[in-house]
Amino acid sequence: MEEQVFKGDPDTPHSISFSGSGFLSFYQAGAVDALRDLAPRMLETAHRFAGTSAGAVIAALAICGIEMDEYLRVLNVGVAEVKKSFLGPLSPSCKMVQMMRQFLYRVLPEDSYKVTTGKLHVSLTRLTDGENVVVSEFTSKEELIEALYCSCFVPVYCGLIPPTYRGVRYIDGGFTGMQPCAFWTDAITISTFSGQQDICPRDCPAIFHDFRMFNCSFQFSLENIARMTHALFPPDLVILHDYYYRGYEDAVLYLRRLNAVYLNSSSKRVIFPRVEVYCQIELALGNECPERSQPSLRARQASLEGATQPHKEWVPKGDGRGSHGPPVSQPVQTLEFTCESPVSAPVSPLEQPPAQPLASSTPLSLSGMPPVSFPAVHKPPSSTPGSSLPTPPPGLSPLSPQQQVQPSGSPARSLHSQAPTSPRPSLGPSTVGAPQTLPRSSLSAFPAQPPVEELGQEQPQAVALLVSSKPKSAVPLVHVKETVSKPYVTESPAEDSNWVNKVFKKNKQKTSGTRKGFPRHSGSKKPSSKVQ
Protein backbone atom coordinates (compact mmCIF):
# COMPACT_ATOMS: atom_id res chain seq x y z
CA MET A 1 0.00 0.00 0.00
CA GLU A 2 1.39 3.40 -1.00
CA GLU A 3 2.17 6.00 1.58
CA GLN A 4 -0.70 8.40 2.00
CA VAL A 5 0.16 11.97 1.14
CA PHE A 6 -3.01 13.55 2.49
CA LYS A 7 -5.77 12.13 4.65
CA GLY A 8 -8.93 11.59 2.70
CA ASP A 9 -7.24 9.74 -0.12
CA PRO A 10 -9.88 7.37 -1.55
CA ASP A 11 -7.23 4.89 -2.70
CA THR A 12 -5.86 4.47 0.84
CA PRO A 13 -7.87 3.89 4.04
CA HIS A 14 -9.03 6.97 5.94
CA SER A 15 -11.15 7.51 9.06
CA ILE A 16 -13.77 9.97 10.26
CA SER A 17 -14.07 11.03 13.90
CA PHE A 18 -17.13 12.74 15.45
CA SER A 19 -16.74 14.64 18.72
CA GLY A 20 -19.25 14.82 21.54
CA SER A 21 -21.94 17.38 20.80
CA GLY A 22 -25.10 16.83 22.85
CA PHE A 23 -27.98 18.79 21.36
CA LEU A 24 -25.57 20.39 18.90
CA SER A 25 -25.46 17.20 16.87
CA PHE A 26 -27.40 19.33 14.36
CA TYR A 27 -23.98 20.61 13.30
CA GLN A 28 -22.57 17.15 12.65
CA ALA A 29 -25.72 16.10 10.81
CA GLY A 30 -25.23 19.04 8.45
CA ALA A 31 -21.60 18.05 7.85
CA VAL A 32 -22.62 14.45 7.02
CA ASP A 33 -25.26 15.69 4.57
CA ALA A 34 -22.67 17.89 2.88
CA LEU A 35 -20.30 14.94 2.46
CA ARG A 36 -23.11 12.80 1.08
CA ASP A 37 -24.07 15.49 -1.41
CA LEU A 38 -20.62 16.61 -2.52
CA ALA A 39 -18.19 13.78 -1.78
CA PRO A 40 -20.14 10.52 -1.41
CA ARG A 41 -17.05 8.36 -1.92
CA MET A 42 -15.53 9.91 1.17
CA LEU A 43 -18.10 8.13 3.34
CA GLU A 44 -18.10 4.97 1.25
CA THR A 45 -14.34 4.42 1.39
CA ALA A 46 -13.88 5.33 5.06
CA HIS A 47 -12.87 2.15 6.88
CA ARG A 48 -13.30 3.50 10.43
CA PHE A 49 -15.81 5.76 12.15
CA ALA A 50 -15.26 6.95 15.70
CA GLY A 51 -17.66 8.87 17.92
CA THR A 52 -18.55 9.74 21.46
CA SER A 53 -21.84 10.83 23.01
CA ALA A 54 -24.18 12.13 20.29
CA GLY A 55 -21.33 11.88 17.79
CA ALA A 56 -21.38 8.08 18.19
CA VAL A 57 -25.07 8.08 17.20
CA ILE A 58 -24.27 10.18 14.11
CA ALA A 59 -21.48 7.76 13.16
CA ALA A 60 -23.76 4.72 13.52
CA LEU A 61 -26.43 6.34 11.35
CA ALA A 62 -23.84 7.26 8.71
CA ILE A 63 -22.53 3.69 8.54
CA CYS A 64 -26.02 2.19 8.24
CA GLY A 65 -27.02 4.70 5.54
CA ILE A 66 -29.90 6.24 7.52
CA GLU A 67 -30.99 9.70 6.45
CA MET A 68 -30.32 12.51 8.87
CA ASP A 69 -33.83 13.87 8.41
CA GLU A 70 -35.27 11.10 10.56
CA TYR A 71 -32.78 11.80 13.32
CA LEU A 72 -33.45 15.53 13.21
CA ARG A 73 -37.21 14.99 13.45
CA VAL A 74 -36.78 12.97 16.63
CA LEU A 75 -34.36 15.55 17.96
CA ASN A 76 -36.89 18.32 17.32
CA VAL A 77 -39.49 16.42 19.33
CA GLY A 78 -36.96 15.87 22.11
CA VAL A 79 -36.12 19.57 22.26
CA ALA A 80 -39.81 20.42 22.50
CA GLU A 81 -40.14 17.88 25.32
CA VAL A 82 -37.23 19.43 27.19
CA LYS A 83 -38.67 22.94 26.82
CA LYS A 84 -41.89 21.95 28.57
CA SER A 85 -40.42 21.92 32.09
CA PHE A 86 -38.64 24.67 33.96
CA LEU A 87 -35.61 22.50 34.78
CA GLY A 88 -35.28 21.40 31.18
CA PRO A 89 -33.36 18.15 30.75
CA LEU A 90 -32.76 17.97 34.51
CA SER A 91 -36.45 17.50 35.16
CA PRO A 92 -37.44 13.99 36.36
CA SER A 93 -40.29 13.99 33.83
CA CYS A 94 -37.93 14.47 30.88
CA LYS A 95 -38.12 11.49 28.52
CA MET A 96 -35.30 12.47 26.19
CA VAL A 97 -33.16 9.38 26.87
CA GLN A 98 -36.06 6.98 26.42
CA MET A 99 -37.07 8.69 23.18
CA MET A 100 -33.56 8.28 21.78
CA ARG A 101 -33.43 4.58 22.64
CA GLN A 102 -36.79 3.98 21.00
CA PHE A 103 -35.58 5.84 17.92
CA LEU A 104 -32.47 3.62 17.64
CA TYR A 105 -34.53 0.45 18.01
CA ARG A 106 -36.85 1.65 15.27
CA VAL A 107 -34.43 2.90 12.60
CA LEU A 108 -31.44 0.57 12.97
CA PRO A 109 -31.73 -2.60 10.88
CA GLU A 110 -31.52 -6.00 12.52
CA ASP A 111 -28.11 -6.72 11.06
CA SER A 112 -26.73 -3.33 12.01
CA TYR A 113 -24.35 -4.91 14.51
CA LYS A 114 -22.73 -6.87 11.65
CA VAL A 115 -22.22 -3.74 9.59
CA THR A 116 -20.83 -1.73 12.49
CA THR A 117 -18.58 -4.39 13.97
CA GLY A 118 -14.94 -3.43 13.38
CA LYS A 119 -16.02 -0.22 11.66
CA LEU A 120 -17.73 1.77 14.41
CA HIS A 121 -15.59 2.74 17.42
CA VAL A 122 -17.60 4.02 20.38
CA SER A 123 -15.78 5.92 23.13
CA LEU A 124 -16.86 5.13 26.74
CA THR A 125 -15.70 6.13 30.22
CA ARG A 126 -15.49 3.35 32.76
CA LEU A 127 -17.13 4.35 35.99
CA THR A 128 -14.91 2.35 38.33
CA ASP A 129 -11.52 3.84 37.39
CA GLY A 130 -12.42 6.64 34.95
CA GLU A 131 -10.47 5.15 32.07
CA ASN A 132 -11.37 5.69 28.45
CA VAL A 133 -12.55 2.54 26.67
CA VAL A 134 -13.19 2.22 22.93
CA VAL A 135 -15.45 -0.66 21.88
CA SER A 136 -15.90 -1.84 18.30
CA GLU A 137 -17.17 -5.43 18.63
CA PHE A 138 -20.93 -6.03 18.85
CA THR A 139 -22.79 -9.32 18.93
CA SER A 140 -26.36 -8.07 18.63
CA LYS A 141 -28.43 -5.04 17.86
CA GLU A 142 -29.30 -4.61 21.56
CA GLU A 143 -25.63 -4.61 22.49
CA LEU A 144 -24.94 -1.94 19.91
CA ILE A 145 -27.75 0.24 21.26
CA GLU A 146 -26.51 -0.27 24.86
CA ALA A 147 -23.03 0.86 23.88
CA LEU A 148 -24.48 3.99 22.27
CA TYR A 149 -26.65 4.61 25.31
CA CYS A 150 -23.67 4.35 27.68
CA SER A 151 -21.68 6.76 25.53
CA CYS A 152 -24.46 9.39 25.82
CA PHE A 153 -25.18 8.99 29.53
CA VAL A 154 -24.30 12.03 31.66
CA PRO A 155 -24.69 11.43 35.42
CA VAL A 156 -27.44 13.46 37.11
CA TYR A 157 -28.28 14.98 33.75
CA CYS A 158 -29.67 11.74 32.29
CA GLY A 159 -30.22 9.84 35.52
CA LEU A 160 -28.60 8.65 38.71
CA ILE A 161 -27.77 5.04 37.87
CA PRO A 162 -25.37 4.55 34.91
CA PRO A 163 -26.25 1.84 32.35
CA THR A 164 -24.14 -1.26 31.77
CA TYR A 165 -22.37 -2.70 28.75
CA ARG A 166 -21.36 -6.35 29.07
CA GLY A 167 -21.84 -6.15 32.82
CA VAL A 168 -19.70 -3.05 33.36
CA ARG A 169 -21.07 0.43 34.07
CA TYR A 170 -20.02 3.19 31.75
CA ILE A 171 -20.80 6.87 31.40
CA ASP A 172 -20.35 9.47 28.69
CA GLY A 173 -17.11 9.02 26.80
CA GLY A 174 -16.69 12.78 26.47
CA PHE A 175 -15.36 12.99 30.03
CA THR A 176 -12.15 11.24 28.97
CA GLY A 177 -11.99 11.98 25.25
CA MET A 178 -14.14 14.61 23.61
CA GLN A 179 -12.58 13.87 20.22
CA PRO A 180 -12.22 10.06 20.04
CA CYS A 181 -9.32 8.47 18.20
CA ALA A 182 -7.82 11.85 17.35
CA PHE A 183 -4.39 10.17 17.32
CA TRP A 184 -5.29 8.40 14.07
CA THR A 185 -3.16 10.01 11.40
CA ASP A 186 -5.73 9.41 8.70
CA ALA A 187 -8.71 10.67 10.73
CA ILE A 188 -10.84 13.53 9.44
CA THR A 189 -12.07 15.17 12.64
CA ILE A 190 -15.50 16.81 12.83
CA SER A 191 -16.24 18.87 15.93
CA THR A 192 -19.07 21.13 17.00
CA PHE A 193 -16.66 23.34 18.95
CA SER A 194 -14.07 25.64 17.45
CA GLY A 195 -10.54 24.29 17.66
CA GLN A 196 -7.90 22.56 15.56
CA GLN A 197 -10.23 20.03 13.96
CA ASP A 198 -10.63 19.64 10.22
CA ILE A 199 -14.33 20.50 10.11
CA CYS A 200 -15.34 22.85 12.89
CA PRO A 201 -16.60 26.42 13.34
CA ARG A 202 -14.03 29.12 12.72
CA ASP A 203 -14.16 31.84 15.36
CA CYS A 204 -11.95 34.76 16.24
CA PRO A 205 -10.34 33.66 19.51
CA ALA A 206 -10.00 36.03 22.45
CA ILE A 207 -6.45 34.76 23.02
CA PHE A 208 -4.03 33.15 20.62
CA HIS A 209 -3.52 29.92 22.57
CA ASP A 210 -5.96 27.03 22.70
CA PHE A 211 -6.68 25.14 25.89
CA ARG A 212 -7.20 21.43 26.29
CA MET A 213 -10.19 20.01 28.09
CA PHE A 214 -11.35 16.39 28.09
CA ASN A 215 -8.31 15.52 25.96
CA CYS A 216 -9.48 17.87 23.22
CA SER A 217 -8.31 21.24 21.96
CA PHE A 218 -10.69 24.19 22.31
CA GLN A 219 -10.41 27.81 21.36
CA PHE A 220 -11.13 30.26 24.13
CA SER A 221 -13.92 32.34 22.62
CA LEU A 222 -17.34 33.54 23.62
CA GLU A 223 -18.90 31.49 20.85
CA ASN A 224 -17.41 28.30 22.24
CA ILE A 225 -18.71 29.08 25.71
CA ALA A 226 -22.18 29.57 24.24
CA ARG A 227 -21.89 26.27 22.37
CA MET A 228 -21.01 24.40 25.55
CA THR A 229 -24.15 25.78 27.14
CA HIS A 230 -26.31 24.93 24.12
CA ALA A 231 -24.99 21.38 24.04
CA LEU A 232 -26.59 20.59 27.43
CA PHE A 233 -29.41 23.13 27.54
CA PRO A 234 -30.87 23.43 24.04
CA PRO A 235 -31.76 26.85 22.65
CA ASP A 236 -34.65 27.55 20.32
CA LEU A 237 -35.13 25.38 17.27
CA VAL A 238 -34.25 28.28 15.00
CA ILE A 239 -30.77 28.45 16.53
CA LEU A 240 -30.37 24.68 16.31
CA HIS A 241 -31.29 24.74 12.64
CA ASP A 242 -28.66 27.42 12.12
CA TYR A 243 -26.12 24.98 13.56
CA TYR A 244 -27.16 22.48 10.90
CA TYR A 245 -26.53 24.94 8.07
CA ARG A 246 -23.27 26.01 9.69
CA GLY A 247 -22.07 22.41 9.70
CA TYR A 248 -23.00 22.04 6.03
CA GLU A 249 -21.11 25.21 5.10
CA ASP A 250 -18.01 24.25 7.11
CA ALA A 251 -17.88 20.87 5.36
CA VAL A 252 -18.05 22.65 1.99
CA LEU A 253 -15.19 24.92 3.06
CA TYR A 254 -13.15 21.86 3.99
CA LEU A 255 -13.71 20.37 0.53
CA ARG A 256 -12.63 23.63 -1.06
CA ARG A 257 -9.39 23.60 0.91
CA LEU A 258 -8.71 20.05 -0.19
CA ASN A 259 -9.38 20.95 -3.81
CA ALA A 260 -6.92 23.82 -3.54
CA VAL A 261 -4.26 21.49 -2.12
CA TYR A 262 -4.82 18.99 -4.93
CA LEU A 263 -4.80 21.56 -7.72
CA ASN A 264 -1.64 23.24 -6.39
CA SER A 265 0.21 19.95 -5.97
CA SER A 266 3.05 19.47 -8.45
CA SER A 267 3.03 15.67 -8.33
CA LYS A 268 -0.80 15.40 -8.29
CA ARG A 269 -0.42 12.55 -5.80
CA VAL A 270 -2.85 14.17 -3.37
CA ILE A 271 -5.79 12.12 -4.56
CA PHE A 272 -8.60 13.76 -2.59
CA PRO A 273 -10.54 15.25 -4.05
CA ARG A 274 -9.93 13.74 -7.46
CA VAL A 275 -12.58 16.10 -8.72
CA GLU A 276 -13.42 14.30 -11.92
CA VAL A 277 -14.38 11.07 -10.15
CA TYR A 278 -14.57 11.88 -6.46
CA CYS A 279 -16.46 15.13 -5.95
CA GLN A 280 -18.99 17.25 -7.75
CA ILE A 281 -16.72 20.09 -8.77
CA GLU A 282 -19.45 22.68 -9.39
CA LEU A 283 -20.87 22.38 -5.89
CA ALA A 284 -17.60 21.78 -4.05
CA LEU A 285 -15.86 24.75 -5.59
CA GLY A 286 -18.94 26.94 -5.33
CA ASN A 287 -19.09 27.58 -9.08
CA GLU A 288 -22.51 28.35 -10.48
CA CYS A 289 -23.78 26.85 -13.69
CA PRO A 290 -23.84 29.21 -16.69
CA GLU A 291 -27.61 28.96 -16.90
CA ARG A 292 -27.94 30.10 -13.31
CA SER A 293 -25.31 32.81 -13.50
CA GLN A 294 -26.74 34.55 -16.56
CA PRO A 295 -30.01 35.74 -15.00
CA SER A 296 -28.17 37.11 -12.00
CA LEU A 297 -25.78 38.97 -14.31
CA ARG A 298 -28.65 40.45 -16.26
CA ALA A 299 -30.40 41.52 -13.10
CA ARG A 300 -27.20 43.14 -11.87
CA GLN A 301 -26.80 45.06 -15.13
CA ALA A 302 -30.43 46.15 -15.02
CA SER A 303 -29.98 47.44 -11.49
CA LEU A 304 -26.88 49.40 -12.53
CA GLU A 305 -28.73 50.94 -15.48
CA GLY A 306 -31.63 51.84 -13.21
CA ALA A 307 -29.27 53.49 -10.76
CA THR A 308 -27.66 55.70 -13.42
CA GLN A 309 -30.78 56.47 -15.48
CA PRO A 310 -32.41 59.16 -13.26
CA HIS A 311 -29.34 61.43 -13.47
CA LYS A 312 -29.84 62.34 -17.14
CA GLU A 313 -32.77 61.42 -19.29
CA TRP A 314 -34.26 62.34 -22.68
CA VAL A 315 -37.72 63.79 -22.44
CA PRO A 316 -39.92 63.21 -25.51
CA LYS A 317 -41.93 65.98 -27.02
CA GLY A 318 -45.12 66.73 -25.15
CA ASP A 319 -44.13 64.72 -22.09
CA GLY A 320 -44.10 66.81 -18.97
CA ARG A 321 -42.57 64.15 -16.70
CA GLY A 322 -45.31 64.53 -14.11
CA SER A 323 -45.21 68.36 -14.05
CA HIS A 324 -47.28 71.08 -15.70
CA GLY A 325 -44.34 72.66 -17.49
CA PRO A 326 -44.13 73.37 -21.21
CA PRO A 327 -43.44 70.57 -23.68
CA VAL A 328 -39.77 70.05 -24.40
CA SER A 329 -38.43 68.49 -27.57
CA GLN A 330 -34.72 68.47 -26.68
CA PRO A 331 -32.74 66.50 -24.08
CA VAL A 332 -32.91 68.31 -20.78
CA GLN A 333 -31.35 67.68 -17.43
CA THR A 334 -33.50 66.62 -14.55
CA LEU A 335 -34.28 68.76 -11.51
CA GLU A 336 -31.36 67.19 -9.68
CA PHE A 337 -28.87 69.03 -11.91
CA THR A 338 -30.73 72.24 -12.81
CA CYS A 339 -31.25 73.85 -9.42
CA GLU A 340 -31.74 72.98 -5.83
CA SER A 341 -35.00 74.83 -5.31
CA PRO A 342 -37.30 77.09 -7.33
CA VAL A 343 -37.19 80.87 -7.05
CA SER A 344 -38.99 81.63 -3.82
CA ALA A 345 -37.14 84.62 -2.35
CA PRO A 346 -38.64 88.12 -2.39
CA VAL A 347 -36.96 90.14 -5.09
CA SER A 348 -37.50 93.85 -5.43
CA PRO A 349 -38.67 95.39 -8.70
CA LEU A 350 -35.17 96.74 -9.22
CA GLU A 351 -33.75 93.24 -9.67
CA GLN A 352 -36.71 91.90 -11.60
CA PRO A 353 -36.24 91.39 -15.36
CA PRO A 354 -38.44 93.58 -17.53
CA ALA A 355 -41.99 92.33 -17.70
CA GLN A 356 -43.25 90.87 -20.94
CA PRO A 357 -46.50 92.29 -22.31
CA LEU A 358 -49.53 90.23 -21.39
CA ALA A 359 -52.20 89.01 -23.77
CA SER A 360 -55.41 90.99 -23.62
CA SER A 361 -57.78 88.33 -24.85
CA THR A 362 -56.50 85.06 -23.36
CA PRO A 363 -55.29 84.33 -19.82
CA LEU A 364 -51.66 83.53 -19.16
CA SER A 365 -50.82 79.92 -19.97
CA LEU A 366 -47.64 77.92 -19.53
CA SER A 367 -47.71 76.53 -23.05
CA GLY A 368 -46.40 79.74 -24.59
CA MET A 369 -43.40 80.13 -22.29
CA PRO A 370 -39.88 79.14 -23.29
CA PRO A 371 -38.28 76.16 -21.54
CA VAL A 372 -35.82 78.19 -19.47
CA SER A 373 -34.93 77.43 -15.85
CA PHE A 374 -34.24 80.56 -13.81
CA PRO A 375 -31.62 80.87 -11.07
CA ALA A 376 -32.04 79.53 -7.58
CA VAL A 377 -31.84 82.42 -5.10
CA HIS A 378 -31.23 81.77 -1.42
CA LYS A 379 -33.85 83.28 0.86
CA PRO A 380 -32.57 86.57 2.38
CA PRO A 381 -34.09 88.18 5.49
CA SER A 382 -37.63 89.28 4.76
CA SER A 383 -38.13 92.99 4.38
CA THR A 384 -41.65 92.86 5.80
CA PRO A 385 -42.08 91.01 9.13
CA GLY A 386 -44.79 88.40 9.14
CA SER A 387 -44.91 87.98 5.39
CA SER A 388 -45.27 84.39 4.23
CA LEU A 389 -43.54 83.34 1.06
CA PRO A 390 -45.12 80.26 -0.51
CA THR A 391 -42.89 78.02 -2.56
CA PRO A 392 -44.17 76.11 -5.54
CA PRO A 393 -44.34 72.35 -5.21
CA PRO A 394 -41.36 70.38 -6.54
CA GLY A 395 -43.42 68.89 -9.36
CA LEU A 396 -44.00 72.37 -10.96
CA SER A 397 -41.39 74.23 -12.93
CA PRO A 398 -40.02 77.46 -11.41
CA LEU A 399 -42.03 80.59 -12.13
CA SER A 400 -40.64 82.94 -14.72
CA PRO A 401 -40.40 86.70 -14.23
CA GLN A 402 -43.27 87.17 -16.68
CA GLN A 403 -45.57 85.49 -14.15
CA GLN A 404 -44.17 87.46 -11.22
CA VAL A 405 -44.55 91.07 -12.41
CA GLN A 406 -48.14 92.21 -12.80
CA PRO A 407 -49.78 95.61 -12.42
CA SER A 408 -51.25 96.36 -9.02
CA GLY A 409 -54.12 98.42 -10.31
CA SER A 410 -55.74 95.49 -12.09
CA PRO A 411 -56.64 92.03 -10.71
CA ALA A 412 -53.61 89.73 -10.50
CA ARG A 413 -53.61 87.03 -13.13
CA SER A 414 -52.87 83.51 -11.86
CA LEU A 415 -52.89 80.05 -13.39
CA HIS A 416 -56.27 78.99 -12.07
CA SER A 417 -58.07 81.88 -10.33
CA GLN A 418 -58.09 85.67 -9.96
CA ALA A 419 -57.83 87.57 -6.69
CA PRO A 420 -58.12 91.31 -5.95
CA THR A 421 -54.92 93.08 -5.03
CA SER A 422 -54.35 94.59 -1.61
CA PRO A 423 -53.24 98.21 -1.13
CA ARG A 424 -49.85 96.99 0.14
CA PRO A 425 -47.81 95.31 -2.59
CA SER A 426 -47.19 91.59 -1.96
CA LEU A 427 -43.68 90.22 -2.39
CA GLY A 428 -44.63 86.59 -3.11
CA PRO A 429 -43.30 84.59 -6.01
CA SER A 430 -46.52 84.97 -8.00
CA THR A 431 -47.06 88.75 -7.94
CA VAL A 432 -44.88 91.78 -7.22
CA GLY A 433 -46.79 95.00 -6.70
CA ALA A 434 -45.53 97.95 -8.74
CA PRO A 435 -47.55 100.90 -10.03
CA GLN A 436 -46.58 100.48 -13.63
CA THR A 437 -48.68 100.29 -16.75
CA LEU A 438 -47.57 97.76 -19.30
CA PRO A 439 -48.64 97.75 -22.93
CA ARG A 440 -50.69 94.70 -23.84
CA SER A 441 -49.72 92.61 -26.79
CA SER A 442 -49.93 89.01 -27.90
CA LEU A 443 -47.80 86.32 -26.27
CA SER A 444 -46.67 85.20 -29.68
CA ALA A 445 -44.17 88.07 -29.70
CA PHE A 446 -42.38 86.76 -26.62
CA PRO A 447 -38.96 86.09 -28.18
CA ALA A 448 -38.85 89.71 -29.45
CA GLN A 449 -36.69 92.34 -27.79
CA PRO A 450 -38.28 93.49 -24.52
CA PRO A 451 -39.35 97.16 -24.20
CA VAL A 452 -36.25 98.57 -22.55
CA GLU A 453 -37.29 102.18 -23.17
CA GLU A 454 -40.04 102.05 -20.55
CA LEU A 455 -37.76 100.61 -17.86
CA GLY A 456 -36.25 103.92 -16.90
CA GLN A 457 -39.63 105.65 -16.69
CA GLU A 458 -41.48 103.20 -14.50
CA GLN A 459 -38.87 101.91 -12.05
CA PRO A 460 -38.16 105.24 -10.30
CA GLN A 461 -41.89 105.60 -9.67
CA ALA A 462 -42.10 102.13 -8.15
CA VAL A 463 -39.09 102.80 -5.93
CA ALA A 464 -40.47 106.14 -4.85
CA LEU A 465 -43.79 104.63 -3.78
CA LEU A 466 -42.10 101.83 -1.86
CA VAL A 467 -39.80 104.22 0.00
CA SER A 468 -42.54 106.75 0.77
CA SER A 469 -44.85 104.10 2.21
CA LYS A 470 -42.19 102.22 4.22
CA PRO A 471 -38.75 103.82 4.39
CA LYS A 472 -37.17 100.98 6.38
CA SER A 473 -37.53 98.56 3.51
CA ALA A 474 -34.68 100.15 1.59
CA VAL A 475 -31.92 98.39 3.52
CA PRO A 476 -33.07 94.84 2.78
CA LEU A 477 -33.41 95.80 -0.86
CA VAL A 478 -29.71 96.56 -1.02
CA HIS A 479 -28.99 93.20 0.56
CA VAL A 480 -31.12 91.47 -2.01
CA LYS A 481 -29.25 93.23 -4.74
CA GLU A 482 -25.94 91.89 -3.46
CA THR A 483 -27.35 88.40 -3.19
CA VAL A 484 -28.60 88.15 -6.74
CA SER A 485 -25.98 90.35 -8.38
CA LYS A 486 -24.49 87.35 -10.19
CA PRO A 487 -27.35 85.13 -11.23
CA TYR A 488 -26.74 81.58 -12.35
CA VAL A 489 -28.98 80.74 -15.27
CA THR A 490 -29.64 77.10 -16.13
CA GLU A 491 -31.48 76.68 -19.35
CA SER A 492 -32.26 74.14 -22.01
CA PRO A 493 -29.47 73.38 -24.51
CA ALA A 494 -31.89 73.98 -27.36
CA GLU A 495 -32.66 77.63 -26.48
CA ASP A 496 -30.49 80.64 -27.21
CA SER A 497 -29.45 82.31 -23.97
CA ASN A 498 -28.24 85.59 -25.52
CA TRP A 499 -31.51 87.44 -24.96
CA VAL A 500 -31.62 86.39 -21.32
CA ASN A 501 -28.07 87.60 -20.71
CA LYS A 502 -28.83 90.89 -22.45
CA VAL A 503 -31.94 91.49 -20.37
CA PHE A 504 -30.18 90.74 -17.09
CA LYS A 505 -27.16 92.77 -18.08
CA LYS A 506 -29.22 95.81 -19.03
CA ASN A 507 -31.37 95.48 -15.96
CA LYS A 508 -28.30 95.33 -13.74
CA GLN A 509 -26.74 98.41 -15.33
CA LYS A 510 -29.96 100.36 -15.05
CA THR A 511 -30.42 99.31 -11.45
CA SER A 512 -26.99 100.53 -10.43
CA GLY A 513 -27.57 103.82 -12.21
CA THR A 514 -30.87 104.34 -10.47
CA ARG A 515 -29.35 103.55 -7.07
CA LYS A 516 -26.77 106.28 -7.37
CA GLY A 517 -29.37 109.02 -7.84
CA PHE A 518 -32.06 107.54 -5.62
CA PRO A 519 -33.33 109.99 -2.94
CA ARG A 520 -34.27 108.82 0.56
CA HIS A 521 -37.47 110.88 0.69
CA SER A 522 -40.13 111.25 -1.90
CA GLY A 523 -39.60 114.17 -4.19
CA SER A 524 -40.27 115.34 -7.65
CA LYS A 525 -40.04 112.92 -10.50
CA LYS A 526 -36.82 112.73 -12.33
CA PRO A 527 -36.86 113.06 -16.08
CA SER A 528 -36.92 109.73 -17.82
CA SER A 529 -33.88 108.59 -19.69
CA LYS A 530 -33.23 105.72 -21.98
CA VAL A 531 -30.83 102.92 -21.27
CA GLN A 532 -27.55 103.39 -22.95
From Swiss-Prot:
Enzyme superclass (EC): transferase
GO molecular function: acyltransferase activity, transferring groups other than amino-acyl groups; omega-hydroxyceramide transacylase activity; structural constituent of skin epidermis; triacylglycerol lipase activity
Catalytic activity, reaction form: an N-(omega-hydroxy-ultra-long chain fatty acyl)-sphingoid base + a (9Z,12Z)-octadecadienoyl-containing triacyl-sn-glycerol = an N-[omega-(9Z,12Z-octadecadienoyloxy)-O-ultra-long chain fatty acyl]-sphingoid base + a diacylglycerol; an N-(omega-hydroxy-ultra-long chain fatty acyl)-sphing-4-enine + a (9Z,12Z)-octadecadienoyl-containing triacyl-sn-glycerol = an N-(omega-(9Z,12Z-octadecadienoyloxy)-ultra-long chain fatty acyl)-sphing-4-enine + a diacylglycerol; N-(30-hydroxytriacontanoyl)-sphing-4-enine + 1,2,3-tri-(9Z,12Z)-octadecadienoylglycerol = N-[30-(9Z,12Z-octadecadienoyloxy)-triacontanoyl]-sphing-4-enine + di-(9Z,12Z)-octadecadienoylglycerol; N-(28-hydroxyoctacosanoyl)-sphing-4-enine + a (9Z,12Z)-octadecadienoyl-containing triacyl-sn-glycerol = N-(28-(9Z,12Z-octadecadienoyloxy)-octacosanoyl)-sphing-4-enine + a diacylglycerol
Keyword Transferase (UniProt): yes
Statement: the UniProt record of this protein carries the keyword Disulfide bond: no
This protein's UniProt keywords: Cytoplasm, Disease variant, Ichthyosis, Lipid biosynthesis, Lipid metabolism, Transferase
Domain PNPLA: 16-185
Compositional bias annotation for Basic and acidic residues: 310-322
Span of the annotated motif GXSXG: 51-55
Composition-biased stretches (Low complexity): 380-389, 397-411
Stimuli inducing this protein: Up-regulated upon induced differentiation of keratinocytes.
Any GO BP annotation: triglyceride catabolic process
Tissue-by-tissue expression: Expressed in the digestive system. Expressed in the epidermis of skin keratinocytes. Strongly expressed in the granular layer. Expressed in the upper epidermis and eccrine sweat glands of the dermis and in the region of keratin filament bundles, which is more pronounced in upper epidermal layers and in the lower cornified layers.
Cell compartments where the protein resides: Cytoplasm
Residue span of region Disordered: 290-457, 489-532
EC number: 2.3.1.296
GO cellular component: cytoplasm; lipid droplet; membrane
Ranges of Basic residues composition bias in the record: 517-532
Disease: Ichthyosis, congenital, autosomal recessive 10: A form of autosomal recessive congenital ichthyosis, a disorder of keratinization with abnormal differentiation and desquamation of the epidermis, resulting in abnormal skin scaling over the whole body. The main skin phenotypes are lamellar ichthyosis (LI) and non-bullous congenital ichthyosiform erythroderma (NCIE), although phenotypic overlap within the same patient or among patients from the same family can occur.
Biological role stated in the UniProt entry: Omega-hydroxyceramide transacylase involved in the synthesis of omega-O-acylceramides (esterified omega-hydroxyacyl-sphingosine; EOS), which are extremely hydrophobic lipids involved in skin barrier formation. Catalyzes the last step of the synthesis of omega-O-acylceramides by transferring linoleic acid from triglycerides to an omega-hydroxyceramide. Omega-O-acylceramides, are required for the biogenesis of lipid lamellae in the stratum corneum and the formation of the cornified lipid envelope which are essential for the epidermis barrier function.
PANTHER family: CALCIUM-INDEPENDENT PHOSPHOLIPASE A2 IPLA2 -RELATED (PTHR12406), OMEGA-HYDROXYCERAMIDE TRANSACYLASE (PTHR12406:SF23)
Protein name, per record: Omega-hydroxyceramide transacylase
